[in-house]
Every structure is written in structure tokens, then in C-alpha cells.
């Protein structure tokens, strides 16, 4: 059964367009807080490779730029979009820059964190934490920044084959 809490969420794309999560019903979703000036930034390449490998089977990857960790996403929407395209050829959707922790955290991350804690804590610890959501909208896994995109393939396969 579809999860109304997850599919009731919405956000805004980097270009300012509404992005209702109801459009994600029936898809596997990988949600990542991203940054342009982080030691983990090269993960964009692996995320794009995952997207190309699995998008036709129903995987959507959503990147959420965040400047809360070391000020590593200082740019505006146009600078972020240009960086992602020029350096990594990113074609998966990038959302508007937002906080992932604290009172002003994006509601998407408030929800994700409430569903999957990391080491008994809800707080996002750094850029490039990842949440995997199954085709019915259930948060099934959370991965640290250290988890490479390629290492997620077995979990993504499980979700896509379910």
C-alpha cells in the first residue's frame, strides 16, 4: 500500500518548479543531500552512473543541495546547476538548496530522519547521506556519506525487484 505521508510531501526544484512526491508513486527513490565543495562531491559521478543504470527500471535520484556542513554549498541555484552539469553531467533532478537539520530543515528531511535513524540519532551528520525509499514510499535504508553510490546497487536491486 502506498505511504500517504511520503507521497504527501512536496518540494521545489532548483529551477523553482513545484515537485510533488505523489509523482514518485511506484518508483524507487534515492534522496541525497549534496554539496559542490565537499570531499564527497565526486560521488555525483557515481550517483549519475546509478541513475543511468536504473532509471529505466524505476529509480529516481533526488539531490538536495545543502550549505549546513562547512559552508560547502555556497552557490545560488544557477551556480549549483551549472556545476553539476559541467563537472558531472548530472541529469537526475536537483532540488532547491535547503537545510537538512534544525528548525528550518526541509520537511522531506524531517520525514526521512524520523523514519530511519543513523547510530540512534536522527541528525544528518554530513553531505552525501543517502535515503532509499521503496516503490510504496517506505524508507527502507539510510547510508552514511562514506557509502559510495556503487555500494548501494545491491540494495537498489532488491527494492526494484520487490
UniProtKB/Swiss-Prot annotation:
Catalytic activity, as annotated: 2 glutathione + H2O2 = glutathione disulfide + 2 H2O; a hydroperoxide + [thioredoxin]-dithiol = an alcohol + [thioredoxin]-disulfide + H2O
E.C. code: 1.11.1.24, 1.11.1.9
Modifications after synthesis and translation: S-selanylation may increase or be important for glutathione peroxidase activity.
Pfam families in alphabetical order: GSHPx (PF00255)
Record keywords: Cytoplasm, Detoxification, Oxidoreductase, Peroxidase, Selenium, Selenocysteine
Signals that turn on the gene: Strongly induced by singlet oxygen generated from photooxidative stressors (by high light, rose bengal, neutral red, methylene blue, dinoterb, nitrofen, the antioxidant biosynthesis inhibitors norflurazon and isoxaflutole, or a switch of dark-adapted cultures to light). Mildly to moderately induced by oxidative stress (by hydrogen peroxide, tert-butyl hydroperoxide, and paraquat). Not induced by salt stress (by sodium chloride).
Domain of life: Eukaryota
A single BP term in Gene Ontology: response to photooxidative stress
UniProt subcellular location: Cytoplasm
Function: Has thioredoxin peroxidase activity. May also have glutathione peroxidase activity, although this activity is controversial. Protects cells against reactive oxygen species, which may include photooxidative stress, hydrogen peroxide and organic hydroperoxides.
PANTHER family named among the record's database cross-references: GLUTATHIONE PEROXIDASE
Protein's UniProt name: Glutathione peroxidase-like peroxiredoxin GPX5
Amino acid at each position: 500500500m502506498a505511504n500517504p505521508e511520503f507521497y504527501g510531501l512536496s518540494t521545489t526544484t532548483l529551477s523553482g518548479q513545484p515537485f510533488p512526491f505523489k509523482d514518485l508513486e511506484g518508483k524507487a527513490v534515492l534522496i541525497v543531500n549534496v554539496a559542490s565543495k565537499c570531499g564527497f562531491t565526486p560521488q555525483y559521478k557515481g550517483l549519475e552512473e546509478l541513475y543511468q543504470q536504473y532509471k529505466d527500471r524505476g529509480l529516481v535520484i533526488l539531490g538536495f543541495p545543502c550549505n549546513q556542513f562547512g559552508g560547502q554549498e555556497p552557490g545560488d541555484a544557477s551556480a549549483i546547476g551549472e556545476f553539476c552539469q559541467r563537472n558531472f553531467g548530472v541529469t537526475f533532478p536537483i532540488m532547491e538548496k535547503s537545510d537538512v537539520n534544525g528548525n528550518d530543515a526541509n520537511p522531506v528531511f524531517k520525514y526521512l530522519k524520523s523514519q530511519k535513524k543513523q547510530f540512534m540519532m536522527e541528525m544528518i551528520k554530513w553531505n552525501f547521506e543517502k535515503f532509499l525509499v521503496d516503490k510504496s514510499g517506505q524508507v527502507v535504508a539510510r547510508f552514511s556519506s562514506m557509502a559510495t553510490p556503487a555500494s548501494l546497487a545491491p540494495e537498489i536491486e532488491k527494492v526494484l525487484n520487490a
